[in-house]
């Protein structure tokens, strides 16, 4: 099955991938803007999960045409992913924390809570390679949400156990995003690549 990057590339789009350090929300926004500054045309900014908070903060960049939230947090001013998630907790097990303040999904719960619609071997590899998220990033608050000024598109993953699907629906309704809903786990970008690519292409029009 083709992934979303392969589909977009085949359809003539150029794809750049940000590798945020996940040390703080400000650091991750800065890393994203660094990549955006290298673009030479209108850009669709896509974020999954915590990445939604990043694109909310980085989306004021002049290159950004629209935003796509893929089972992602979409904070308003003063909100963090911690405050949003705490208000409507997901069905999955609580995150674990390292001694130095980085959060991760218990590998034993990863398949069920993050990627239930993927093969076990693939989910287990993802569990072993997950990038830990600092508490500082999880508690960083939005200051000037880009979705208030630019068109936004969003995917609700109806079987999500990492973000409450009802929270996804309420955030996207609040922002008046163009929404699709897929019967998927939190790893919707992997289990439904064609649908995700189609929404990104729609956002690029």
Where are these regions (language model features)?
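Active-site catalytic motif of lipid deacylating hydrolases and related acyltransferases
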Residues: 1-41
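Conserved alpha/beta-hydrolase catalytic His-Asp/Glu region
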Residues: 102-146
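Glycine-rich phosphate-binding loop signature in dinucleotide/nucleotide-binding domains
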Residues: 38-41, 148, 203-205
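Conserved serine/cysteine hydrolase catalytic core
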Residues: 28, 132-194, 198
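Gly/Ala-rich beta-loop-alpha elbow adjacent to hydrolase catalytic centers
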Residues: 46-51, 55
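Active-site loop/turn elements of alpha/beta-hydrolase fold enzymes
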Residues: 20-22, 72, 184
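Flexible "cap/lid" loop of the alpha/beta hydrolase fold
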Residues: 60-107, 134-141, 163
